[in-house]
Amino acid sequence: MTTFLGNPVTFTGKQLQVGDTAHDFSLTATDLSKKTLADFAGKKKVLSIIPSIDTGVCSTQTRRFNQELSDLDNTVVITVSVDLPFAQGKWCAAEGIENAVMLSDYFDHSFGRDYAVLINEWHLLARAVLVLDENNTVTYAEYVDNINTEPDYDAAIAAVKSL
């Protein structure tokens, strides 16, 4: 059972599992452009999904994945939340993280529904990490049961490095 702030929460949809093909998406970048999964074609992808960049755990998760994986060839870390693109951009500027890919699902929550991470009770995204290979096949999936805790960074990073 997944919990948020100590309370059980529900989701719509089916969580992706290892071996599944990732769903396409259309999300808003910090410059208000639309980004799709196809924009990252041919790259290994880490989808770092968070409730809000304005929380300590989400900030730590975003910073850590960007620091530890930014030097890997042909790899992109994509952080997804329902924060407004302006808030995501402001966070990147304040943290001095210039090349982070921050995408927002604020507009219609379609990513949250398609990836089964939209918390029905709060309309925030749950914490999850998905690693996709160059063909968008899920090679690692972690949906964090207690959304207030950090993901297993070591396992996710090892999954990316093994590709």
Curated annotation (Swiss-Prot):
Annotated InterPro entries: Redoxin, Thioredoxin-like_sf, Thioredoxin_domain, TPX, Tpx_CS, Tpx_Peroxidase_subfamily
Reactions the enzyme catalyzes: a hydroperoxide + [thioredoxin]-dithiol = an alcohol + [thioredoxin]-disulfide + H2O
One Pfam family named in its UniProt record: Redoxin
Active site, UniProt feature: 58 (cysteine sulfenic acid (-soh) intermediate)
Molecular function as annotated in GO: thioredoxin peroxidase activity
Keyword annotations of the record: Antioxidant, Disulfide bond, Oxidoreductase, Peroxidase, Redox-active center
Domain Thioredoxin: 16-162
Disulfide bonds, paired cysteine numbers: 58-92
SUPFAM superfamilies: Thioredoxin-like
EC number: 1.11.1.24
Gene3D superfamilies listed in its UniProt record: Glutaredoxin
Note: The active site is a conserved redox-active cysteine residue, the peroxidatic cysteine (C(P)), which makes the nucleophilic attack on the peroxide substrate. The peroxide oxidizes the C(P)-SH to cysteine sulfenic acid (C(P)-SOH), which then reacts with another cysteine residue, the resolving cysteine (C(R)), to form a disulfide bridge. The disulfide is subsequently reduced by an appropriate electron donor to complete the catalytic cycle. In this atypical 2-Cys peroxiredoxin, C(R) is present in the same subunit to form an intramolecular disulfide.
Function: Thiol-specific peroxidase that catalyzes the reduction of hydrogen peroxide and organic hydroperoxides to water and alcohols, respectively. Plays a role in cell protection against oxidative stress by detoxifying peroxides.
Family, as annotated: Belongs to the peroxiredoxin family. Tpx subfamily.
HAMAP family listed in its UniProt record: Tpx
Name of the protein in question: Thiol peroxidase
Organism of this sequence: Streptococcus sanguinis
Lineage, opening ranks: Bacteria, Bacillati, Bacillota, Bacilli, Lactobacillales
